[in-house]
């Protein structure tokens, strides 16, 4: 392959799709049973980026109003035209992967990459791991580590040892009545969460994502306690 992308989340699927559109031979590798089986993001992004990839309108909810809330104040900033959106994350990632596959990307699920392959000059020339039929090896000119927080490839390369600062979050997806589908809310302050923030992001059709994020190691609070 010209390019091997490890991780089928937003970065990995987007990279594979963009590369394949430019004629690059790509393998996209995901350790779970399916692309987007587990979602670890609330899916807020810019409409400009959505349009760049041609993501269908039914994959996102446009946002015009941004409300920032603290214990003593609230400010809302509004756009006349929506510039941000909340993605249907699973639907979007699966769409990206399907489109990538249509233009020649080889997708390998249930494949856990756990090592890098180096040549005599100590250059990275591939990765290896365990697939559905046992050990599997991929050789490539370029490797992209899109494994997120786990940083599987970066750790194997020695680029990352352990994250010293990171965020931990928890989120519910719920159906509520009379929600403003064009407004998201961001809450800060000890009343909501220490060393972090809370949020309410609407997906449309009276569905919202309600979540809390906490900075580590600044706080040892379990974010689920603040939901």
Predicted regions mapped to residue ranges:
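Generic structural signal for well-ordered, non-membrane alpha-helical segments
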Residues: 38, 42, 46, 85, ...
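Structural motif
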Residues: 2-3, 142
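Short, histidine-centered active-site or binding-site loop motifs used for metal coordination
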Residues: 30-33, 81, 212-216
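A conserved beta-strand/loop capping segment in the N-terminal third of enzymes
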Residues: 45-97, 110
């Amino acid at each position: 392959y010209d390019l091997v992308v490890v991780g089928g989340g937003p970065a990995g699927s987007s990279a594979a799709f963009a590369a394949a559109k430019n004629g690059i031979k790509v393998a996209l590798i995901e350790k779970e049973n399916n692309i987007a089986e587990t979602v670890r993001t609330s899916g807020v992004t810019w409409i400009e980026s959505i349009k760049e990839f041609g993501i269908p309108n039914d994959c996102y909810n446009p946002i015009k109003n941004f409300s920032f809330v603290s214990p003593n104040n609230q400010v809302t900033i509004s756009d006349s035209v929506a510039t941000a959106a909340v993605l249907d994350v699973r639907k979007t990632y699966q769409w990206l992967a399907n489109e990538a596959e249509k233009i020649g990307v080889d997708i390998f699920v249930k494949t856990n990459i756990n090592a890098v392959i180096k040549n005599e000059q100590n250059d990275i020339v591939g990765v290896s791991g365990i697939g559905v039929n046992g050990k599997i090896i991929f050789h490539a000119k370029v490797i992209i580590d899109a494994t997120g927080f786990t940083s599987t490839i970066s750790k194997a390369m020695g680029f990352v040892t352990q994250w010293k600062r990171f965020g931990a979050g928890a989120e519910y997806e719920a159906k509520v009545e009379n929600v403003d589908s064009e407004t998201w809310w961001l809450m800060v302050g000890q009343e909501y969460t220490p060393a972090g923030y809370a949020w309410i992001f609407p997906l449309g059709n009276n569905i919202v994502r309600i979540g809390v994020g906490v900075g580590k190691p600044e706080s040892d609070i379990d974010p689920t306690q603040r939901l």
